[in-house]
Swiss-Prot record:
Involved in DNA repair and RecF pathway recombination. The gene is recO. NCBIfam families: reco. Belongs to the RecO family. GO terms for biological process: DNA recombination; double-strand break repair. This is DNA repair protein RecO. Keywords: DNA damage, DNA recombination, DNA repair. GO terms for cellular component: bacterial nucleoid. It comes from Macrococcus caseolyticus (strain JCSC5402).
Length: 251
């Protein structure tokens, strides 16, 4: 019996000389793995099995991995591939969401997050900001929730008083907390406030947000440290992005 599902390709792996195993995230937020037979030697599927493609997949599946029958492309997100930075940030977003979900998990929000992020990357020049926002939105999927709203040290909720982020207290903190946690990460007040806004804003509202590059740099550094400290997931495309930026700075 054939099944139909709309989804976005998030992973593809060569299998033998002729075949591909592709994984797509469907609208219900479920990862579906399919064998695409002879996909490496045939033009049957066109480019529809490439990363970022949103397709209507037709496949057979009883238990375990299914077998792909055909794909009908809805959106190729072609523009993402025209810029190496945008493409790598898109790969980062895909990998981050993929790693956050168990193979049998259902999470419609993850699909919506991925779809909106790719659409915005395709239509704007904010790939790095979009990736930052997705990084923040994905943290709860990994079981970690940062606190940019108030200081758990003293309950202070006045944003203009925050000067650092404390891993010890897992929250923004004021000057007083530095006595207890001298290793809190110093941050500009503005970047901490922007992190609070980004953690609260729906991703659909991203197109209306403009943030200066220096703040994005500062926020990204903190978010990466949070992933290293609390989540511990290795994202290959993040390392590639860091290497690319180092090369640009060297030039």
């Amino acid at each position: 019996m054939l099944k139909k599902a709309v989804g976005i390709v998030i992973r593809r792996v060569a299998y033998g000389d002729n075949h591909l195993i592709i994984t797509f995230l469907n609208e219900a937020g479920v990862k579906v793995a399919l064998m695409a037979r002879n996909a490496r030697k045939s033009t049957k599927y066109g480019s529809g099995l490439d990363l970022f493609y949103e397709n209507l997949f037709i496949f057979s599946q009883f238990k375990g991995m299914g077998t792909l029958s055909s794909v009908d492309t809805i959106n190729s997100h072609y523009e993402i591939r025209e810029d190496i930075y945008v493409m790598t940030y898109a790969q980062y977003v895909v990998e981050l969401i993929d790693r956050a979900l168990e193979e049998d998990e259902t999470n419609p929000y993850a699909y919506q997050l991925l779809k909106v992020a790719l659409t915005h990357m395709e239509r704007s020049d904010k790939a790095r900001l979009i990736a930052l926002l997705v990084s923040i939105k994905c943290m709860p999927l990994y079981g970690y929730v940062p606190n940019f709203k108030y200081s758990t040290y003293d309950g202070n909720m006045t944003h203009k008083d925050f000067i650092a982020y404390s891993f010890q207290f897992n929250s923004v903190v004021t000057q007083e907390a530095l006595i207890e946690d001298p290793h809190a990460i110093p941050m500009t007040n503005k970047s901490l406030y922007m992190l609070y806004l980004l953690s609260e804003v729906p991703i659909e509202s991203l197109s209306s947000i403009n943030i200066e590059q220096s703040l994005i740099d500062e926020m990204e550094t903190l978010v990466y440290k949070m992933y290293d400290e609390f989540i511990g997931v290795f994202i290959k495309s993040r390392k590639i992005l860091e290497q690319m930026r180092r090369l640009d700075n060297y030039k």
